[in-house]
């Protein structure tokens, strides 16, 4: 039996220019708890909507990437959107990602990929064709994001700001690793010093690695000191985070520091971000991971 109400279902269709950031966008929606499908053929959209309708609360938030593959694909998508309007029980929001031609060409050169519509291999040819095909769809979009001057992180933050707000999930937990030798992070709300934990730096095989590597992670986490510390830290943060959110704070920066910001702090920052991601929107940054002492 269907228990969905129209206002309970959120369907976002992500489309736009090739190279404008649809991959980053769909990953951002996944982090927001959306059920995501990449490159769903428009001909399957009506059946997919029925599945949504019958799934009760299991598919109440869905994001679909609809890429352009040619005129036939585009015509099918427009027809599917018209059919959705006739259904009456769902109103999708269309997010159109765009960027200027110069930026799109630059991105194609960086990735060494060819534009899907460019028959001669020249990106500008495909870009011009795509703009023409997408003109009507862009006109239907409720939101148009110009990503020309946005880095992937900034696009992610923009999507979160727009779509998390409507869900009441505006509280963001930013977890940052850093090295004390490079100074304290000036934007940190909470700072935890993990220099008391056993240091993988002194094991030659792990020195060039970081806390993103499994060998280092396992080494750091195997010690009883680490396990007791993480247990107490999670208990403390589980108490504090709801209070910060209740007070109206939009984001919290938790900084985890070790000596150089390579091993222990990276491991613990990843651990915290992973632990709290089901309750909050979390984002992890490793401030000093690219810095290496030169001797």
From Swiss-Prot:
Is Chloroplast one of the keywords?
A: no
Binding of GTP occurs at 67-70
Concerning Pfam families, the annotation shows: PapZ_C (PF22740), RapZ-like_N (PF03668)
What GO molecular function annotation could you give as one example from this UniProt entry? ATP binding
Signal peptide coordinates: none
Which keywords are on file for this protein?
Answer: ATP-binding, GTP-binding, Nucleotide-binding
Which residues are noted in the entry as ATP-binding? Answer: 16-23
Q: At the top level of its lineage, which domain of life is listed?
A: Bacteria
Q: Describe its function.
A: Displays ATPase and GTPase activities.
Q: Which family does it belong to?
A: Belongs to the RapZ-like family.
Protein name (database record): Nucleotide-binding protein BPUM_3115
What is the species of this protein?
Answer: Bacillus pumilus (strain SAFR-032)
């Amino acid at each position: 039996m269907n228990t969905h109400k129209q206002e309970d279902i959120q369907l976002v269709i992500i489309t736009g220019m090739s190279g404008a950031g649809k991959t980053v966008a769909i990953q951002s929606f996944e982090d927001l708890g959306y059920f995501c499908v990449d490159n769903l053929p428009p001909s399957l959209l009506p059946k997919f909507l029925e599945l949504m309708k019958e799934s009760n609360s299991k598919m109440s938030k869905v994001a679909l990437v609809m890429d352009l593959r040619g005129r036939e694909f585009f015509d099918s998508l427009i027809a599917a959107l018209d059919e959705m309007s006739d259904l009456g029980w769902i109103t999708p929001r269309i997010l159109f990602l765009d960027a200027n031609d110069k930026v799109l060409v630059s991105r194609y050169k960086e990735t060494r990929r060819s534009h899907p519509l460019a028959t001669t291999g020249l990106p500008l040819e495909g870009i011009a064709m795509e703009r023409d095909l997408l003109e009507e769809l862009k006109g239907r979009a409720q939101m148009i994001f110009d990503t020309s001057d946005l880095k992937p992180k900034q696009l992610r933050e923009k999507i979160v700001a727009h779509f998390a707000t409507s869900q009441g999930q505006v509280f963001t937990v930013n977890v940052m690793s850093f090295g004390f030798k490079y100074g304290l992070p000036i934007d940190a709300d909470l700072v935890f010093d993990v220099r008391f934990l056993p240091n993988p730096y002194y094991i030659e095989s792990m020195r060039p690695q970081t806390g993103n590597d499994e060998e280092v992670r396992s080494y750091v986490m195997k010690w009883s000191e680490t396990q007791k510390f993480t247990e107490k830290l999670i208990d403390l943060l589980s108490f504090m985070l709801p209070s910060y959110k209740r007070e109206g704070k939009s984001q919290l920066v938790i900084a985890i520091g070790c000596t150089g910001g390579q091993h222990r702090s990276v491991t613990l920052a990843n651990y915290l971000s992973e632990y709290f991601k089901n309750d909050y929107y979390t984002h992890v940054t490793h401030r000093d991971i690219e810095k290496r002492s030169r001797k």
